[in-house]
Amino acid sequence: MRKALKVIGGLLLVSSTALVQAAAEGDSGNTLRLYNWTDYIGETTLADFEKATGIKVVYDTFDGYETVQTKLLTGRSGYDLVMLNASLVPPLIQAGVFQALDKQQLPSWHNLDEQVVSNLQGYDPGLKYSAPYTWGSSGVTYNVDKIKARMPDAPIGSLAMLFDPAIVSRFADCGVTLMDAPTEVIPLALQYLGKDPRSAAPADLKAAEQLLLGIRPYIRKFDSVNYLTSLPNGDVCLALTWSGDYATAQARAVEAKKAIKLAFFIPKEGSLIWFDNLYIPKDAPHASNAHRFIEFLLQPQTMAKVTNFIHYANSNAAATALVQADIRQDPAIYPDAQTRERLFAQKTQTPKDMRAITRVWSTVKTGF
C-alpha cells in the first residue's frame, strides 16, 4: 500500500499514462497488465512469473481504492487484474464490471484458507469473481521509546491511545497520524464509543464526528502511505496503520541502521479485519494470462515469498508453513484465534451512507 514508484524484480512500475499509451500501441497478447498498490507483491514475484511463463508484466500502481473503482466503472480500464478490498466489491459485481473466474484454469484453488474463503462469502457468494490474496487488521503502530518517555503509563493496547484527547495530546509533539480512510477510522471510533462499528446511522456518525474533532488538534497528518517512511525515520511516533506495515516500517529502520524500536497492537476494544483480492475486469484484454498469474500465486512457495516481503498474512493455507518463522509467529500479522474473535469485518455501505460518511470525514479533516 505504497505511493512511490520503484523497480521490483527488474520490472518497471509504470504510470497510468504509460499504461494507456502502451495499450493504445497494442501488444502481442503475451502481456499481463496488473493494477496494485506499490510494494504489495513479492520482491521477485513478477520476474519469477515472467521467467516461468514468458508473459511480460506491466505493473501499474495506485494510492487509493477510489481510483480503482472509478476506472472500473468508467469501463475500458485496460487492466487484466486489479486489487480491491472485498468490502468494496458487491456494488461493482452488481454493476457487472468483473468477469467470472474460470476455476478450471485454477487447479490449485484448493490451497486457499477455508476460513478466509468462508469470510468472503458475504461479499462474493461462491467466490465467483474474487481470487483471495491477503488479509489483515487495522491497529496502532508506535515508537516504544518516544511513547514511554512521554507517558510511562500509557494505555498500550487501547484505542484510547488515539481517541482520548487527554492521552493523544501527550504525543502530539512527536507526531500522530491517522489513515486517510474514513471506512477504517470511523468504524474504530464507533467501536471505541461502544457503538456498532458498522453503523451509518446519523446519530452514530455524529458521535464519531464529535469524537474525532476532539482529537483533531493533535493529528499531524491523515496518511495511509507515508508513515512507512515517517515511522522508521522517527518523524512520527504514533500511527493508525494496517497490520503488516508496522513490520515493514521496522525492517526499514533496521536497514537504515536507525535505533528505532516500533511495536504494534490490535486494540483490545476490537478492530477491523479486511481481505484484499484480485479481480479480472470485464474488458480484460488478456484474461487467460490473468488466470495463469492467479494460478501462479496459488502455489505455496510463491505466496510464502510474497508474505516474506510485504509482511501481510496471505490467504493460501498451504503457504503458511513456508513463511519465515519470525513473520508466521508475529501476532500482529498472524493473530491467534482469541484475537481474531475481536476482529469485525468491514461492511459494504450503500451509496447514500457512503456520502454521509464522506461528509463526516471531510468535516474531521478540515477541523470544522
Question: Whereabouts are the PLM-identified features?
Answer:
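Extracytoplasmic ligand-binding site segments that recognize negatively charged/polar headgroups
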Residues: M83-N85, V89-Y218, V225-P232
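A ligand-binding cleft/hinge motif common to bilobed small-molecule-binding domains
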Residues: L88-P91, L238-A259
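Periplasmic-binding protein-like
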Residues: L205-G214, R220, K258-Y279
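Mature extracytoplasmic/periplasmic domains
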Residues: P281-R342
